Amino acid sequence: MEETCSESPKESNIISFIWHKLLKRVPPPIMICLFFLLLQIFVISVVSQCPPGLTPLFSNSNFNQPLTCTPQDACSCYSSSGSSRFGTICQYASTYNNYICCYSTNTQCGSNSSPQVSASGQVVTCSTNTQCASGYTCNNGACCPNTNSNTCSSNGNNGCLAGQTMVNGQCYNSVNIGSACQSTQQCLGGSQCQNNICQCYSGYVNVNQQCVISNGLNCQLGTVSYNSQCITLASPGQNCQTSSQCIDNSVCMNQMCTCNNNYRLVYGYCVPITSSICQQTQTLVNNQCVLLSIVGETCIANQQCVGGAMCNSGTCQCTNGATAMYGYCISSSSSSCNSNQVSINGMCYNTVQVGGSCSFSQQCLNNAVCTNNICVSTFCSVSCSTNQVCISNQCYNYVSIGSQCVGSQQCLSNSQCISSICQCPQGTQQSNGVCTGNNNNNNQCQPNQVLINNQCYNTVSIGFQCQFPQQCLGNSQCMNSMCQCPTGSTNVNGYCQGGSNGQCNSNQVLINNQCYNTVSIGFQCQFAQQCLGNSQCLNSICQCPSGSSNVNGYCQGGSNGQCNSNQVYYNNQCYNTVPIGSQCQITQQCLGNSQCMNSFCQCPSGTTNVNNFCTTSSSSSNLCSAGQTVQLDSSNQPINCLVSTCPNNSFCQYSSSGQRYVCCRSTSGKKK
């Protein structure tokens, strides 16, 4: 590097001007004192350009001008003049509008070497080399620069600690992808600092904290790409991480594949909800109730076939583009999504950053939730005032109809943020400053609204303001005008999880080991068990079944005994059937041979719950027909062939005595 030999025009001219004026007026003894005082002021002004505890490095030939340097060059502060030293740092000095070399005067590392210093100018002490930054070794309790190289010190960090990097003369911690940052130099794994977050460049994805080219993952059939990994598909009722895993018309809710609206879970399959009078394991074909059939079994109509199969030549078969696996038809497209996409209901959708446009919450990254077609972060570490709401970790004022907005959470009076303006949604109109429905609109609120007291109100995510419990999403409750998770549960990806011990609140019901709010007639629902007053969850609304009407919050009617397929007739009323563990009023409601005890469907004494059926160990012998034996799993329980594949030389058949599908084997050893 070239040394700067010219004097600093700023300090040098000032000193010269003052010196010549004083020579004419001040006696020599006083002049000598003033000279040293001015020299001290000059040195202090230069030293102040270095961090605390450090001193500017001057060349032997020019004491007025510190050595300049290049921040990216670790050797730029080392020269053959003898004034340069190992272990200096390159610091920007505003006085010179340039970078200058700064060093520690500590002599623990020798006369021509400065020990490693922190950003505050403190000498880094050590007992082993591992405590020193790259290019330094521990010597006499201090981290000293390596001087045994012909290319100066090999230290690339210019004096920062291990795990730090130098940015404009300051030491900053190196951070992983997804962490907060101030400069790209901090970001590891080939990422960049964008919006104060270390992120991969466009066209790259994060794989094990390394940015790699986003060319998609080639996952095998039966698996799906998620977070740059191939994960196994999951059937209804099984645990899941994302809805892209879930098959057979199910989505991932509360970490379990749950049947979509208008479908019900029947022994591992999502079966459409119909108004027929058949049992839940049957469907109506030509006015006759016939058993449902899995892949490979006989059929007479498509509606018999479950698991995505179709009736072809009298047998339930998978259509073109699908393969029979685990008793389901698996689409070959399930593994064709790129790593920056997710599979939702058999379609590939791009993942979306917080603030981007979305259709499903599964698209949103960083555990955000798709609210009003925008990925909204559920994470808020800031505390907002009472007239503000937190959106994507920032505080925004609540605003009235007609005002500019960032998200619908800001909008008051049931308005929504449409085109960045709080407006009344379609189907509502402004009346006295509030968005109200048009003559009830036949109960047709928007998909992100709920009907309460003949008015449409926006649904609300956890952590946002509410007026009624029915507005709160994710099983949260409206407490202190805020949707919050009830005691004993926590917010996990926008859903309140907990209550697995069956101890739900009095206004909740246990479904799939989770607590869900009970819902009155006319309000939104996910499961029939939520609906009160003998109503049913139809089109995501608790409604009275055909033939009955709402009388004081209770569905009355149906005296002809024609209840729906998921109901039972008792005392001139239709009651919803409920699985084991759910709330009940009468035993006739309880499925799987359970009984209504203490308002819950429970297995009677001497029996246990096996695949949602109360059974005894001795009762499994008569599940198959004469001359056949039931096949048991590793826990000595009958195999549910709608969930697991039957072993060799066995077959899947419906057991009328057990009211379920089991694997049976002929005692003669021949397959059926």
UniProtKB/Swiss-Prot annotation:
Coiled coil: none annotated. SMART domains: WR1. It is a single-pass membrane protein. Keywords: Membrane, Transmembrane, Transmembrane helix. It is found in: Membrane. The keyword Transmembrane helix applies. Its main location: membrane. Pfam families: EB (PF01683). GO terms for cellular component: membrane. The chain crosses the membrane at residues 26-46. This is Prion-like-(Q/N-rich) domain-bearing protein 25. The gene is pqn-25.
